């Protein structure tokens, strides 16, 4: 379903970007394990902060890469009122990112044993803000209220509400028992204007069928594999 523009099949971090064969869906996927590991080491994050910060790093890398403005940059800021405080990540047009959190040493909160509660760490009483420097006089600034604090849902809602682009964003960071990052990655799919209903339906079914990103990454799937699974090719 998609034609990747770049990417190589190694276990190193990399990103693929492409378009569906019918030209109605823009796709990007990333393996960001080493990026998240490095970010966690620098920030000295506890597991919940690692998961939240890692998701933000992953999302920002894809969002920055999607801009296609050579010297542009994109800043993703998430402020939800939770114990982590504010998450700020800046990406260049290649998807290289840097970022920080105001409180890296947050307490352990689980939805159930073995499942970190990122939403509780980030909070839901706040906003997701995107600042795009597109090498013009003024940067573009968009902001929407947080939906869940899980970050993927919030990025999805941001694009739909602030930029009017129907989007699906899925992010995953698996923190191992020794608090190291086992795998990290994600994908963003965006519908372009004029997409027929059958494209929308097929995409929705593919997202449901594929399920969460983390198990796919843990199974060793590449970004291309994940897009194939979600897009049904």
At which residue positions do the language-model features occur?
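Contiguous, function-dense segments enriched for cysteine-driven chemistry
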Residues: 1
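Interaction interfaces in information-processing and related assembly proteins
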Residues: 4-232
């Amino acid at each position: 379903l998609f034609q990747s523009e770049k990417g190589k099949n190694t276990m190193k971090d990399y990103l693929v970007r492409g378009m569906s064969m019918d030209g109605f869906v823009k796709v990007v996927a990333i393996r960001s394990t080493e990026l998240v590991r490095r970010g966690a080491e620098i920030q000295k994050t506890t597991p919940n902060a690692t998961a939240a910060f890692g998701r933000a790093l992953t999302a920002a890398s894809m969002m920055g890469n999607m801009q296609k403005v050579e010297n542009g940059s994109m800043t993703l800021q998430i402020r939800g009122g939770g114990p982590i405080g504010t998450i700020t990540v800046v990406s260049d047009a290649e998807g290289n990112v840097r970022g920080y959190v105001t409180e890296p040493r947050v307490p352990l909160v689980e939805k159930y044993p073995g499942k970190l509660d990122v939403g509780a760490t980030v909070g839901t009483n706040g906003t997701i803000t995107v600042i795009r420097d597109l090498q013009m006089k003024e940067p573009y600034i968009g902001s929407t209220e947080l939906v869940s604090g899980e970050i993927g849902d919030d990025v999805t809602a941001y694009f739909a509400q602030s930029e009017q682009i129907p989007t699906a964003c899925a992010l995953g960071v698996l923190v191992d028992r020794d608090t190291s990052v086992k795998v990290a990655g994600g994908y963003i799919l965006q519908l372009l204007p004029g997409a027929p209903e059958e494209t929308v339906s097929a995409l929705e079914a593919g997202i449901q069928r594929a399920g969460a990103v983390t198990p796919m990454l843990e199974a060793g799937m590449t970004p291309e594999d994940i897009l194939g699974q979600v897009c049904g090719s």
